[in-house]
Amino acid sequence: MTVVVGYITGKSGRSSLHLGVEAAQTLKTSMTVVTVVPKPWTTPSPARIDAEYATWADQLGSDSQREAQATLDKIAKGFEVSYHKFASRTAGEGLLDAAEELGAQVLVTGSCPHGALGQVVLGSTTDWLLHSSPIPVAISPRGYRGAKSGKLIRVTCAYSGTPESVQVVERVAALTDQLDVKMRVVTYAIRGRTMFPPRVGVHAEDSLLDAWADQLRETLAKLKADNVVGEDVELQVVTGNGWDAALDDTEWDDGELLALGTTSRRSIKTVFLGSHGAKIIRHSPVPVLVLPS
């Protein structure tokens, strides 16, 4: 088993490498850096063009390995790292092929380079992976350089209150027990833009939001009453006028990981995000682990 990290020079920065090292060290396993290069088209073309394409693909793989190795030599000296190049029609398919062939426990990707520093920014490849991967996918915030503590301290599980999300809490609880790290369960009460008709007024909206938050606290408390989580697990309800405000108002520790589950799709074990899950990811200031249903 290994942690597979997708990396290609000039794309997404080095944040995935930093998260990959933390993941591999936490899981006490090896790390494999995978570069996916475009697969040649099967349509006939002049031999010179084919040769130039093959040379370019080889160079892209070599440059990516050299750049990744230079970074990892600084942050993970003596750590077991291997490098592989896969050819595929798309980066996402190549990463899943690599994950299957290499026996990956988790697939790590970086954020899109176009977006706010310090937040998870989904690019097209990562977005596709979140709808297709049969294994957990970890995403690093843009510019992520690892926890100052150098290790995982706590896992926060985003909980929606559905039966499926209870199963996610159980899986995260088992993971935190295995890794001997703290766990927190957080659920969000978000005020919608059209929560009530404007004539009702802000005070009525506040009252409804407070009542909703109280109901969510009761739902969270049931996790302990039903022995889904232990008494030492922190339970928290966070309210906000939007997902961005709610995630900002959530207190995050150095070395924290946000874990969330997915929505079932055709009974296939793949990662498939609901609308709330996607919004949580896009506003997360800490690395995110998305678990397949």
Which residues does each PLM region occupy?
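Glycine-rich, Arg-bearing micro-motifs that act as flexible, cationic patches
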Residues: 106-128, 150, 257-283
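General small-molecule cofactor/ligand-binding pocket signal
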Residues: 32-34, 82-86, 138, 184-186, ...
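Short beta-strand elements of ligand-binding domains
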Residues: 108-111, 136-143, 288-292
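A short acidic, glycine-rich active-site loop
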Residues: 51-66, 203-215
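Small/aliphatic-rich secondary-structure junction motif
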Residues: 1-54, 153-206, 225-228, 232-234, ...
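Structural beta-alpha unit
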Residues: 12, 70-107, 225-258, 266
